[in-house]
Amino acid sequence: MSNQLIYTGKAKDIYTTEDEHVIKSVYKDQATMLNGARKETIVGKGVLNNKISSLIFEKLNEAGVATHFIKKLSDTEQLNKKVDIIPLEVVLRNVTAGSFAKRFGIVEGILLDTPIVEFYYKKDELDDPFINDEHVLFLKIADEKQIAYIKEETLRINQLLKGWFQQIDLQLIDFKLEFGFDKDGNIILADEFSPDNCRLWDKDGNHMDKDVFRRDLGNLTAVYQIVLEKLEQL
């Protein structure tokens, strides 16, 4: 049966379709932080995130990255391949910021010599703890070959994204990815890519991402609209 709600997330609701291997993602006008401890309805956010993520995933597909994205259905909806999500948040950092800067007691804005890939165990009740490769193996989340592939693919995606954002005068500071197994057991990129799960700074150091909400820096949808308009120039 199609159009049955199967999952409610912080930013999206997931529904069944007529194809058991395809799902419909519906983006919501909700902003959260601290694993949902703070929630706000922000009108227009769902439309912007769907448009931005669809645009990015289309470009990643064209570049040969295996993703779950099929197509954008409407302003707030998209079709995705159904995946078995790997319970890892994969974070790539190009520049010191956020929790990374806080953890090591350093200032934000330091360009890292090489990008750093981090893993966080995707478990809300544990506040998504920072884990290493050995923890991933112990928890049987992924094997060594799969860990290596996820890291390599994350680094490749970073190179593509950095290049695209440089073209529109935005610096990609860091971002979070999620991967999953498709129906054939292949690991593919899932979830979304939007200013909700990355940090972007303009040439003046202004935040063009969800930090505008986290730090009460201004109008979130106005910032996301600027990011969308810039991406549409690519």
Swiss-Prot record:
Pfam families: SAICAR_synt. Gene3D superfamilies: ATP-grasp fold, B domain, Phosphorylase Kinase, domain 1. SUPFAM superfamilies: SAICAR synthase-like (SSF56104). GO terms for molecular function: ATP binding; phosphoribosylaminoimidazolesuccinocarboxamide synthase activity. Pathway: Purine metabolism; IMP biosynthesis via de novo pathway; 5-amino-1-(5-phospho-D-ribosyl)imidazole-4-carboxamide from 5-amino-1-(5-phospho-D-ribosyl)imidazole-4-carboxylate: step 1/2. It comes from the Bacteria. Belongs to the SAICAR synthetase family. This is Phosphoribosylaminoimidazole-succinocarboxamide synthase.
